[in-house]
Amino acid sequence: MSVTVVLGSQWGDEGKGKLVDILSAEVDICAHCAGGSNAGHTIVVPVGPEDLRVPFAPQWCLLNPACTGLIGSGVVVHLPSLFSELDALAAQGLDCTNRLFISDRAHLVFDFHRIVDGLKEVELGGSWYHWDNQKWIGPAYSSKASRSGLRVHHLFDDTFAEKFRKLVEGWFKRYGKFEYDTEGEILRYKVLAERLRPCVIDCVVYIHHAISSGKRVLVEGANALMLDLDFGTYPFVTSSSTSVGGVCTGLGIPPKMIGKPIGVVKAYTTRVGGGPFPTEQLNDVGTHLQEVGREFGTNTGRRRRCGWLDLVVLKYSCMINGFDTLNITKLDILDKLPEIKVGVKYLVDGKELSGFPADLDLLAKVDVEYATLPGWNTSIVDVTSCDALPENCRKYIEYIETFLGVPVEWIGVGPGRNSMLIKEVT
C-alpha cells in the first residue's frame, strides 16, 4: 500500500519521462500532482511518425492501455490546451479520454493569465525572469494563493460566470483594461465544462480508495527541486511545490503512503533561463554538453545552459526529498570528455558553506571546488549491462553514490527507451 514517486533533483529537464515510461508498465494509476503546461514531455508514439509533446496528460497512461491517468488537485489546468493535447493523441490512435481523470479541486488557467504574464514581464522590464516558460503558470498560482482563483468544480456552479467576471476585473484593476473577450470566454468554458464533466472526480477519495484496494500508483513530481517555490533558487523558480511535499499536498495523501521516492539526476547540470548556476561552463565544455546533449527546451526550443554535475545541489535535494535510489540520465553525453569534473564544495572567502544558501547574493560569490575524475573516452550507447560499462564510467557512478549516500539503480546510456541499465541495489 504505497506510492512510487519520480522527482527531478536539479533544475528540471533531467529526463524523468524515460524512467516513468519503464515503471509505468507495472502500475495501475499514473498521476501529476502539481505544475501545469510549463513542464514539457516528448514521447514517441508507437503508431504514427510524429513525436508528441504532452505537458498535461500523464504520458505513461497513454503508452500503457491498462493504466489510468490522474491530474491532481495541485495542478493548474488550461482546458483548451488539455483537450488539444487529447485530440492530437486520439489522431495518432491513442484515445485516453475514458482513462484520464481530473481533480475537482484543481485550479483553472485562463487565457487572460497569459496576457497578465506578458504584462508582468513588461512591467519588470525583463530584469527578472521567472522560470514558468510563459505558460501562464505564475498568474494562475497567484490567483490561487490570493483565494480569487477558480477551480474545476466552479465550472458546474451557477455562479461561474459571475465569479469569472470578478476575477477578470481584479486583473483589470491591477494592469489596466487590456483587450479580452470576457463574455466570449464564459461561453467557451460552458462548452468545455460539458466535455470535461465525465472526467471530474474527488481526487482524495479516488486515490485513497485505489491505494487501499492494492492499486499501484506512480507519480511524477513537477519540474525539479531547485525550481521549488520554497527550496529552489527563489525568485528564479516556478510557482508550485516541486519537492516530495508537493506530492502529498497535490494529491491529498499522507507521507507514510510514499513508499519509494526516486531522484532523477542528469549526469551533468543544465538549467533554463536566468538565475544562479554555480557550475555553469561558459566555454568549450559547456558548448560540448549543449550540442552533444541536444539541450534545447521541449516547450520553448531555447538553448539550455550547461555545466558540470553539482553534488552540493544534489546533496541538498537528497536531504529534502529523502531519495531511496537515483536514476542517472544522459551518461553517454560524457563519453568523449578526457576528464570530468564534479562540484563538491561551495567556498566563500576560502570558507566552506555548510549547505546550499538561500541568499542569491551569497550564492553569486561562491567558488566551486571540483573533484576531477578521468573520462572513459568510448561510447557506452550499446552497453547492455552495468558490468560492461568502462571502469572509469563505473567509478564516476560510484563517486556520486558515495558522496550522496544514495545508491544508483538506473543508468541512462542513450536516447532510446531501451537504453536504460538496471543496477542491483543492496
Curated annotation (Swiss-Prot):
<feature type="active site" description="Proton donor">
    <location>
        <position position="41"/>
    </location>
</feature>
<feature type="binding site" description="in other chain">
    <location>
        <position position="238"/>
    </location>
    <ligand>
        <name>IMP</name>
    </ligand>
</feature>
<dbReference type="InterPro" id="IPR018220">
    <property type="entry name" value="Adenylosuccin_syn_GTP-bd"/>
</dbReference>
<feature type="binding site">
    <location>
        <position position="13"/>
    </location>
    <ligand>
        <name>Mg(2+)</name>
    </ligand>
</feature>
<keyword id="KW-0547">Nucleotide-binding</keyword>
<keyword id="KW-0436">Ligase</keyword>
<keyword id="KW-0460">Magnesium</keyword>
<dbReference type="GO" id="GO:0000287">
    <property type="term" value="F:magnesium ion binding"/>
</dbReference>
<dbReference type="InterPro" id="IPR042110">
    <property type="entry name" value="Adenylosuccinate_synth_dom2"/>
</dbReference>
<comment type="subunit">
    <text>Homodimer.</text>
</comment>
<comment type="pathway">
    <text>Purine metabolism; AMP biosynthesis via de novo pathway; AMP from IMP: step 1/2.</text>
</comment>
<dbReference type="GO" id="GO:0005525">
    <property type="term" value="F:GTP binding"/>
</dbReference>
<keyword id="KW-0479">Metal-binding</keyword>
<feature type="binding site">
    <location>
        <begin position="330"/>
        <end position="332"/>
    </location>
    <ligand>
        <name>GTP</name>
    </ligand>
</feature>
<dbReference type="InterPro" id="IPR042109">
    <property type="entry name" value="Adenylosuccinate_synth_dom1"/>
</dbReference>
<feature type="binding site">
    <location>
        <begin position="12"/>
        <end position="18"/>
    </location>
    <ligand>
        <name>GTP</name>
    </ligand>
</feature>
<keyword id="KW-0658">Purine biosynthesis</keyword>
<comment type="function">
    <text>Plays an important role in the de novo pathway and in the salvage pathway of purine nucleotide biosynthesis. Catalyzes the first committed step in the biosynthesis of AMP from IMP.</text>
</comment>
<protein>
    <recommendedName>
        <fullName>Adenylosuccinate synthetase 2</fullName>
        <ecNumber>6.3.4.4</ecNumber>
    </recommendedName>
</protein>
<dbReference type="GO" id="GO:0005737">
    <property type="term" value="C:cytoplasm"/>
</dbReference>
<keyword id="KW-0342">GTP-binding</keyword>
<feature type="binding site" description="in other chain">
    <location>
        <position position="302"/>
    </location>
    <ligand>
        <name>IMP</name>
    </ligand>
</feature>
<feature type="binding site">
    <location>
        <position position="40"/>
    </location>
    <ligand>
        <name>Mg(2+)</name>
    </ligand>
</feature>
<feature type="binding site">
    <location>
        <position position="304"/>
    </location>
    <ligand>
        <name>GTP</name>
    </ligand>
</feature>
<dbReference type="InterPro" id="IPR027417">
    <property type="entry name" value="P-loop_NTPase"/>
</dbReference>
<dbReference type="GO" id="GO:0046040">
    <property type="term" value="P:IMP metabolic process"/>
</dbReference>
<feature type="active site" description="Proton acceptor">
    <location>
        <position position="13"/>
    </location>
</feature>
<feature type="binding site">
    <location>
        <begin position="412"/>
        <end position="414"/>
    </location>
    <ligand>
        <name>GTP</name>
    </ligand>
</feature>
<feature type="binding site" description="in other chain">
    <location>
        <begin position="13"/>
        <end position="16"/>
    </location>
    <ligand>
        <name>IMP</name>
    </ligand>
</feature>
<keyword id="KW-0963">Cytoplasm</keyword>
<feature type="binding site">
    <location>
        <begin position="298"/>
        <end position="304"/>
    </location>
    <ligand>
        <name>substrate</name>
    </ligand>
</feature>
<dbReference type="GO" id="GO:0044208">
    <property type="term" value="P:'de novo' AMP biosynthetic process"/>
</dbReference>
<dbReference type="InterPro" id="IPR001114">
    <property type="entry name" value="Adenylosuccinate_synthetase"/>
</dbReference>
<comment type="similarity">
    <text>Belongs to the adenylosuccinate synthetase family.</text>
</comment>
<feature type="binding site">
    <location>
        <begin position="40"/>
        <end position="42"/>
    </location>
    <ligand>
        <name>GTP</name>
    </ligand>
</feature>
<dbReference type="InterPro" id="IPR042111">
    <property type="entry name" value="Adenylosuccinate_synth_dom3"/>
</dbReference>
<feature type="binding site" description="in other chain">
    <location>
        <begin position="38"/>
        <end position="41"/>
    </location>
    <ligand>
        <name>IMP</name>
    </ligand>
</feature>
<dbReference type="Pfam" id="PF00709">
    <property type="entry name" value="Adenylsucc_synt"/>
</dbReference>
<dbReference type="GO" id="GO:0004019">
    <property type="term" value="F:adenylosuccinate synthase activity"/>
</dbReference>
<feature type="binding site" description="in other chain">
    <location>
        <position position="223"/>
    </location>
    <ligand>
        <name>IMP</name>
    </ligand>
</feature>
<feature type="binding site">
    <location>
        <position position="147"/>
    </location>
    <ligand>
        <name>IMP</name>
    </ligand>
</feature>
